[in-house]
Amino acid sequence: MIVWDLAVVGAGPAGLSAAYAAARAGVRTLVLERAAHPRYKTCGGGLIGTSLAAVRDRIEVPAHDRVDRVTFTWDGRRGFTRRHRAPLVTMVRREEFDDRLRAAAVAAGAEVRERAPVRAVEQDPEGVSLRLADGTTVRARTVIGADGSSGVTARHVGVRYRQVDLGLEVELEVPPEQQERWRGQVLLDWGPLPGSYAWVFPKDDRLTVGVIAARGEGERTREYLRRFVDRLGLADAPAAHDSGHLTRCRADDSPLRQGRVLVVGDAAGLLEPWSREGISYALRSGELAGAAVAEGDLAGYERAVGERLVPSMRAGYRLLDLFTRRPEIFHGLVATPPGWRMFVRFCQGRASFDETLARREVRALLSLLERIPASRRSVPTS
């Protein structure tokens, strides 16, 4: 039986980043993917600057729009639009973006095996066995799990979650006049449910329209999406895709490794808690894990995540708490020049949330706001 140096479970941005980093360093790498590229993935598909930097030397990003304008509303009211001189977010379709990452991993030397779902993970002193759906077994010295938060590797490692949200999304086909209306612009709507928001992301002849809210509010979340689409005048637009998924943010003490099995991206619960942005965390954690395997220092992956990713997640939880308790204050802050600058820096990858919140004036403001009681969840009247 072939024994691979590394087997990666899952061929999304996290898994393919791990495979690319490892294979490029000479690690004999196999990627196991349950589907076949190109495949649709429920995702807003907005790449912030941090994500663009992570793939700059790897692929040409298949951009369908570059956004420089953002309209903010609070449950459809009190809207305002801000514009920046340079693009803030790059829009991609995940089937194209992921397929380019796959090609880059293959070019680096990795083998990608598609339609190969993994059903079980077992470790022994010599390595790791992966049992596939067809009954065959793959052996590897090390495994990186990138099969999502509900996958077998997350269960094997024992990942624990602090926050679970339900995201619902429709991909709407729109005529030329709607394409022109939305070109270069996104809409973010702070929603009526605690911690919820909705978005419109333009991608040429399609609009990705979605909402996200805490799990357990399924019916109200679906109603929020329906009302949001109606309000946009898009209720009759044909849907190319209509889907949903759960996003899970890790608990602070959740493991990232069990023996010779590491988890990355969604499988590790690595994403930004306030925006639920996950692609940048997937790309970075995958690269960190692949490099750790190449260097023979698996514990180094845990250290790197703790140093480079966890601080921003902790800051994101503080922002989410303020947003959940007082969305009207959050809406007002984004309208101010300092609030807009913070948003721009986040989008362009020029400053992480922990770096921003560490500034003295921001610390003082946040400390004051955190002492304000939570508001009643009311719809704005003007």
State the predicted function of each range.
Residues 1-6:
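Extreme N-terminal starter segment of soluble prokaryotic enzymes
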Residues 207, 251-315:
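Conserved mid-domain beta->alpha element of the FAD-binding
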